[in-house]
Every structure is written in C-alpha cells, then in structure tokens.
Amino acid sequence: MEEIKIGVVGLGYVGLPLARLFATKYAVVGFDLKKERIEALNRGIDRTLEVSEEVMKSVLRPSVPKRGEKGLYCSCDPEDLRDCNYYIITVPTPVDKHNRPDLTPLIRASETVGQVIVRGDIVIYESTVYPGATEEDCIPVIERVSGLKYNVDFFAGYSPERINPGDKQHTVEKIKKVTSGSTPGVAEKVNALYHSVIVAGTHLAPSIRVAEAAKVCLLYT
C-alpha cells in the first residue's frame, strides 16, 4: 500500500484547514512564503482564526513527519517538501482592476513544486482558475523547472476549493468535494485521497477542465 506524504503549498484560509484535516491521517508539510506566518503556526496560532489553537496543537509535529506517520509541520523552506508524493496548491488567484485573473501566485507555487517533484508524484490544484489554466498555464511551469514530462513522469489533479472563510458550521470536511485527475488512474487516486477525509463525500469529474468549469459555475450561481 502506498505511503502518502502531502505537501500543501499556501497556508491561507483554504490551505491551512485542509492541511490540518489531512494531518489527522497522513504526514503533511505545510509550506508558505511568509516566515512570520510559519512561526506563528508552529506555535499553534492561526491569526485568520480558521483553525483553533487547540486543534492546531493536536496535529502539529516538531519536525518534518516521515511517510507513514501522521501530523503537520509548517515550513517556509521548499526543501522540507522534497519527500512528499502528493502536492496540493492552494494559493490565492486575485484579479486585477480589469477583473482578469492574476496567475502569478500559481506560477510561483508551480515553480516551487517543480524544484522538488520526482517521478510518480501527483500535483493537485485547488486555486480558482478558468477552465484550461491548470494544464495550459501551470503544468508547463513544472515541466520547465523539473525537466519531467507531464503524464509520463508526474501527474496532476484539480479539486476546486469551496471554503467559506469564517463559516464554522460548513468546515472543509463537511463540504462535498469535486475531484479530477489527468489520467483515469490518477483521478481515482486523487478522489480516494480526498474521500478518506471528507465526510460529506466526493464527486469525481470526468476531466480536469470539467472540474475547473464546475468551480466557475459555482461562483455565478
């Protein structure tokens, strides 16, 4: 059986609750560029108030957990991500004054993952994007940085985040997740990963593009 280790890139209101949830079952490394944020999180303090100090401390580990272990270690050092075999990117996608999406955070997060990814790894995007962005804008960045080939050496998934910040009733595990993967086998793996922690269940979309479109539809309904 595959031993799973997850790297969550971006520890904001989406990434942190997700990292905390996965850490109840798996080894998780939470990565964020903000050093002050990482230092606070490793003391159990989430200034966004999405995760309580008690809950944070219940999953925190003093060092990077190994595959097969459980728990969360937060870091701003990309090297701490190196042993992960699943990467979940949860960085924001702001819009400019013309309401066009700014993919800069996603591109930078993809570069970070590209530095540490190895053959067989799976990269899952949760950030809100337009249909096609994952495979047309983000994946080529990973290929360029890593030297690996998409759907040959590494694979991808998309599962749109649906967290409502500040909502203590509809927390991440209580919201049904749409999942997808770049091949049928990878799609099943991605779906199984989320299904193992999401009590509300999952829905496996037929493709990454369909899953991306599902999030766009949710924004306008």
Feature roles, as predicted:
Residues 95-162:
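Rossmann-like NAD(P)(H) cofactor-binding subdomain of soluble oxidoreductases
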Residues 11:
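Glycine-rich Rossmann-fold phosphate-binding loop(s) that bind the pyrophosphate
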Residues 89, 155, 162-205:
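Dinucleotide-binding Rossmann-like beta1-alpha1 core, especially the glycine-rich loop
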Residues 22:
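Aromatic pocket-lining residues of Rossmann-like dinucleotide-binding sites
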Residues 15-16:
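N-terminal Rossmann-fold NAD(P) dinucleotide-binding loop
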Residues 2-4, 27, 33-86, 92-100, ...:
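Conserved N-terminal Rossmann-fold NAD(P) cofactor-binding segment
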Residues 220-221:
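Conserved small/polar residues in nucleotide/adenosyl-binding loops
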